[in-house]
Swiss-Prot record:
It holds the Pfam family Pribosyltran. The lineage of its organism: Bacteria, Pseudomonadati, Chlorobiota, Chlorobiia, Chlorobiales. This is Adenine phosphoribosyltransferase. It is found in: Cytoplasm. It catalyses: AMP + diphosphate = 5-phospho-alpha-D-ribose 1-diphosphate + adenine. It is an enzyme of class 2 (transferase). Keywords: Cytoplasm, Glycosyltransferase, Purine salvage, Transferase. The gene is apt. PROSITE patterns: PUR_PYR_PR_TRANSFER. The keyword Cytoplasm applies. It comes from the Bacteria. Coiled coil: none annotated. It comes from Chlorobium luteolum (strain DSM 273 / BCRC 81028 / 2530).
Amino acid sequence: MPIKSRIRAIPDYPKKGIMFRDITTLIKDPVGFRLVIDNLTQRYLENGVDFDVIVGIEARGFIIGSALAYALGKGFVPVRKPGKLPADTVSQEYALEYGTDKIEIHIDALEKGARVLLVDDLLATGGTALAAAPLIEKVGGVVSEMAFIVNLPDIGGEEKILAKGYKVFSLTAFEGE
């Protein structure tokens, strides 16, 4: 059973008209979780994308990013919601469909010039990833690529990210679904 078929679809969540793609059914399955990490590991061992550290976006980016960092022998840096990191941070505000939100990273999280693989579970609008990228840059990092389990291309996030000059990789996509 491939990765895509292990992802549950929940209609009208979190609001009417939204088809929510729930990766919890994928990662609770040991074979599914292994497929995700093994496929990403293979890509980054063989693909030639150079990076020094993985940055994961709260919360599901932590699950995938930390397992991938372990598999590749890389470090892991969290990007978190405000007030969750104990040392000095920098923050970035970003737009939501119904307001704004903010994410933070420790100011000493990355070495100057560190090449970063930015990881999250799902790419929809691209808002969170496009907020995390300038955070990484503020603390001296360079985004080598952004990796996701799921891309929802009809929502347009991938186009926005590519337009900003970043590279994108996703394991699967739900186009027109």
